[in-house]
C-alpha cells in the first residue's frame, strides 16, 4: 500500500480516485504530472489534484486519442489502493492485456466496479483479481470473455460484501485451478455458475469455503473428472441444507480433507454412481460437525472420515446423474 503508483511519486495509499480522461492535456491545477507512456512521447500522461485539500489525490490518466492502452502485464495495476472508493476505467483499453492477476487486490474501499468495457479476450491470468476487496457490493462482469483464462484461483477471495455474483457469461473451458475462488464470500447468497465448464479443473480446494450465506449452489453442469483436490470445498457453508453433487466424478480425487466440515444444517448430499473415493488418501474431518446430515445412516460424531462417504451405509444419498 505504500508503494508508488505506476512508477510515479504518488503512493498508492495517497490516492482517493482514479479516472481515465478523454485526452492527455494536463490541467493548470495539477499538483504533479508525468509521462507514463511506454514510448515516453507524451501520448499518455498521469497527473493528480487535491481539490478537497485532504492530502488524498484525485489521479487522472489521459491518452492522446482518448484511449489509454493497458500494458500486456496488468498484474497489480490497481492493487492496494486502500483509500480509493471511485475508479472510472471506461477509457481503459485492455485488448492486449494477458495478465490481470491481483489487479484490484486489497483495494478495500471500492464499493462498486463497472468493468463492462473491459476487453479480456487475451487474458490468461485472473487469479487474485478481486482478492480482499472487502467493500465491493456491485461487480459487473457481463462482458468478460474468459475463453483463454487458465488461472482463477482466489479470484473473489474474501469479497465479504458481495451478495450476488452473476457469472453465466464466463467460459471456463481452459481453467485448471479454481482453488479458493469464492473463499470467504460471507454475504454471497446467489451465484450463477451455469456457464461453467470445469472439465480441465484439477483443484477445487476451498472453492466455496466459508460461504456462510449460500443456501443453494447449482453444480449440475460441473465436470469434476480431472479434479484431484476437493479439500475444504464446502467447509463452513453453514446455510446449505442440501447439496447435489450427483454429476461429480471423483475417481481422480486424492484429497477430501474437511470437504463438508461445519455444514451443520446440511441434511442431504446427493451423489451418483460416479462418486468414487478409491483414490482418496487424505480425508480427515470430512464430515466434521455435519450434525444434521442423514443418508443411509444418520450422522455419528465419532465417524467423520471418508468411510462414511457412500450411500450404502454412509451419510450420502443416491441420485442418478443428469450428465
Predicted features along the sequence, with ranges:
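Negatively charged
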Residues: 1-323
